[in-house]
Curated annotation (Swiss-Prot):
The chain crosses the membrane at residues 4-24. Its cofactor is heme. Expressed at low levels leaf blades, shoot apex and elongating stem. Signal peptide: none annotated. Its EC number is 1.14.19.-. It comes from Oryza sativa subsp. japonica (Rice). Belongs to the cytochrome P450 family. This is Cytochrome P450 90D2. Heme binds at C437. The gene is CYP90D2.
Length: 490
């Protein structure tokens, strides 16, 4: 395990070091001086800064952060400084900005709940280039609230959940039945294939076929550029990703124009485009809608399939939890079969232990390790000053693995959620506040449906696989399991 991790981290770290040095040198010096100058000459303000260090000249502490991020324990960067400074809130210098890092649940909650009068989103330049200025991840104020509210309400609607449930069942049943006994099923690959097509249908109304396959290929070309070198010259990774986005945008904007041309308001809306064009606001342009449809496809390629895959991995390593989840799902299937009824989305979400498994997977897996915000004014919280222009890194992972908040935090223990309070800010896998992930209910539903069909269809033996944590969480081999079909009376 150690040698495999080292084999992955060494070349990746070398590349990261070169990239950071080449791209950030001049900008880092400028920002560093600006950040370090905050509160200059003001001893009282300086005293209120969190403890910490800006690290090395030019690169700050970025190289050590990246090195830890590629390791099996990314939180080591934060844990080391918590012990050194005696505080879960400390200052650092990461990716070109003076940064306050918080692994304190109360401070993290404060930042997440704050609006654009205190903090605005901050992302790497390559990501902002690809997302576009009208992305829900980047816009602020009333427009952000409107788009988030419209999309969030649609994602919570019974209509979409019913459609998604039927689509998942229709795609999963033949997909799983195609695996003969003793064959190898790669959970991550299957989950991506199923979830992407279903979510795209819910977003833009596109059905399976040639255009769906082209969109999938272009999206895969697009997504690999999100954490790339921010250079747009022909042939570079970012350039190729931008070209892929243009092709996707042309397809989506054609769909938008067709919908606008024939539109009498669909009731209920069939997809997210229907919802946004039905609002009637001049601010919701075709470009804004297409940008956000592409952004909302990211969970289908990344976070939801990884949630499913990690759940299978953790269950495979915890036979007692797997057995209880199997029993719960088999009982539901038998009960609905005896009643002559098809499972509805409410049935899947009623499976309490399955929901505990998903919650624990989100806590332990930390698919989203944290988020960054930038202070637009001086902000003070719990006696710590966050100067205007500084970034704040809200590190979910350290909070989720804090042994003062969770007993045996590195142990997969779904039973802890029978009594655990999730309202105190110590559990934030989907972010929070006005930027809370609008698709959190759909992510849980998709994972519940996938797990139900998997555990009621197969027994399996998992092959060894390892979690890669950076730049995104994934399983190195795609989580291969060797499956055996269950008999109907099992």
């Amino acid at each position: 395990m150690v040698s495999a991790a080292a084999g992955w981290a060494a070349p990746a770290f070398a590349v990261a070091a070169v990239v950071i040095w080449v791209v950030l040198c001049s900008e880092l010096l400028r920002r560093r001086r600006r950040g370090a100058g905050s509160g200059k000459g003001d001893a009282a303000a300086a005293a209120r800064l969190p403890p910490g260090s800006f690290g090395w000249p030019v690169v700050g502490e970025t190289l050590e952060f990246v090195s830890c991020a590629y390791s099996p324990r990314p939180e080591a960067f934060v844990d080391k400084r918590r012990k050194l400074h005696g505080s879960a809130v400390f200052r650092s210098h990461l990716f070109g900005s003076a940064t306050v890092v918080t692994a304190d649940a109360e401070v993290s909650r404060f930042v997440l709940q704050s609006d654009a009068r205190a903090f605005v989103p901050w992302y790497p330049r390559s990501l902002t280039e690809l997302m576009g200025k009208s992305s829900i991840l980047l816009i602020n104020g009333a427009l952000q609230r409107r788009v988030h509210g419209l999309v969030g309400a649609f994602f919570k609607s019974s209509h979409l959940k019913s459609q998604l449930t039927a689509d998942m069942r229709r795609r999963l049943s033949p997909a799983l039945s195609s695996f003969p006994d003793s064959s190898l099923l790669h959970v991550q690959h299957l989950a991506k294939s199923v979830v992407f097509e279903i979510l795209v249908r819910g977003l833009i109304g596109l059905e399976a076929g040639e255009e769906m396959q082209q969109l999938k290929q272009q999206f895969q070309e697009f997504i690999v550029g999100l954490m790339s070198l921010p250079i747009k010259l022909p042939g570079t990774r970012l350039y190729r990703s931008l070209q892929a986005k243009k092709k996707m945008a042309r397809l989506i904007q054609r769909i938008i124009r067709e919908k606008r041309a024939r539109r009498a308001a669909a009731s209920p809306p069939r997809d997210a485009i229907d919802v946004l064009i039905g609002d009637g606001s001049d601010e919701l342009t075709d470009e804004l809608i297409s940008d956000n449809m592409i952004d909302l496809m990211i969970p289908a390629e990344d976070s939801v399939p990884v949630l499913i895959t990690l759940a299978v991995k953790f269950l495979s390593e915890c036979p007692l939890a797997l057995h209880q989840l199997e029993e719960e799902n088999i009982q539901l299937k038998r009960r609905k079969t005896d009643m002559g009824e098809t499972l509805q989305w409410t049935d899947y979400m009623s499976l309490s232990f399955t929901q505990h498994v998903i919650t624990e997977t989100l806590r332990l897996g930390n698919i989203i390790g944290g988020i960054m915000r930038k202070a637009v004014r001086d902000v003070e919280v719990k006696g710590h000053l966050i100067p205007k222009g500084w970034c704040v890194f809200v590190y979910f992972r350290s909070v989720h693995l804090d042994d003062t908040l969770y007993d045996e935090p590195y142990k997969f223990n779904p039973w802890r959620w029978k009594e655990k309070d999730m309202s105190n800010g110590s559990f934030t896998p989907f972010g929070g506040g006005q930027r809370l992930c609008p698709g959190l209910d759909l992510a849980r539903l998709e994972a519940s449906i996938f797990l139900h069909h998997l555990v009621t269809s197969f027994r399996w033996v998992a092959e060894e696989d390892h979690i890669v944590n950076f730049p995104t969480v994934r399983l190195k081999r795609g989580m291969p399991i060797r499956v055996t079909a269950k008999e109907d009376d099992d």
